[in-house]
Amino acid sequence: MGVNDEFMELLIQMGPEMKPPKNIGSYVMEQALEVPIDQKLAFKYLWQSNEYLKEEEAFCNSIGFLLNKESSVAILFFYKGQAESLFYLIDVQTYNYKTGKLIDEINGVAGFKGDDAVCNMQVNSYNEIVFKTLAAGQTNEIVLNISNKGKIQR
């Protein structure tokens, strides 16, 4: 497959590859809090070596990832922060998985908090992911369209 070795290690830690169609709810997302991503890899890739953050503060947990093998694009779904957070915001990043280079990202696309706010992620295809959040009796839906080059449109 010709993947950057360090980026491949990140993908292994992200868990099994998701295949569309796939539906993931808050309960499954919460289970990921039990398995954090290595802080060195999280700092380098998911936090993009943020100058305002120390490596030992780079907490991340995986929701999953997709690989569009036709265009060498990896789509990562995760949340940043400690597992004990009160609210979890979902971030999405796209990478060229052969080089490990970031293509695009969107932070805080959806969120959940125990029983007070629930989220559902529906992966229709490699190019369309729908997030539905229900909080305080209101439903919010966000559709992400991801081009074959990895660009994210909301």
Where are these regions (language model features)?
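Terminal domain-start segments
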Residues: 1-60
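Hydrophobic/aromatic beta-strand elements that line small-molecule binding cavities or substrate pockets
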Residues: 63-65, 91-95, 118-121, 142-144
